[in-house]
Amino acid sequence: YEMSASLVGSEMCIRDSLKAGDAFSDFVGPLGCPSELIHEDIEELKKQKIVFIAGGVGTAPVYPQVKWLHEHGVDADVIVGAKNKDLILLEEEMKAVAGNLYITTDDGSYVRKGMGTDVLKDLYAQGKKYDKCIAIGPLIMMKFVCLLTKELGIPTVVSMNPIMVDGTGMCGACRLQVGDEIKFACVDGPEFDGHLVDFDQAMKRQQTYKTEEGRAMLAALEGETHHGGCGNCN
């Protein structure tokens, strides 16, 4: 198995302490339901024009889906966005399985400058059309992808990545508003109709543990010398 991780707070120390072959506890996954693509008829999928939009570490879960489609004779286009060149993941692997791979960076350090939405706009301006969009990445990125795809009339699936504590839906940390329903990403998701997700609420809830993350990071870096009571230096 391969794992890609975005380390937050005290988790940053994992990068320096773990070596190949080491083990760590308190890790569970995968959670929720598999991609809805596996439930669709392959012959019908072959008739569709599918585009994936991946942001940052969202490239990691996009890759196996694109690879699975490729192995079943379906070539999907992929748009990969990242803050800079150093944060582009799995480029060569993605090239081998994607119909077309489009890369963009926020700072213009690689290929082109802009967001994934800019690439999709340009593709549509060139006459490209898509029947389905699958977006995986930061919440703010998926929000703006969905605003654009709704305008363009492209059905869109998003893979939500809220904080998950117990992974069973009991803690409520991954609670989402999807249309008129309350959903829990760890059991009902992670995939939902992107045009129904309340992204503003999701982003607000994502900040729930921001202060604790900062304090944990400070404790990991400074040990017993830190105070951290006021939280101003998080």
Where are the predicted features?
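Glycine-rich, flexible loop/turn motifs
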Residues: 3, 27, 156, 182, ...
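Short Fe-S-cluster ligation motifs
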Residues: 184-188, 192-234
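Single conserved hydrophobic/aromatic residue that forms the stacking wall/gate
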Residues: 1-9, 13-14
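Local cysteine-cluster metal-coordination motifs and their immediate loop/turn environment
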Residues: 59-61, 139-140, 161-191, 225-234
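Short secondary-structure transition/capping segments
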Residues: 24, 76, 125-132, 156, ...
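Short acidic, glycine/serine/threonine-rich loops at helix termini
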Residues: 146, 169, 197-198
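FNR/FR-type flavoprotein reductase catalytic core
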Residues: 17-165
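A generic structural signal for secondary-structure junctions
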Residues: 8, 99, 121, 150, ...
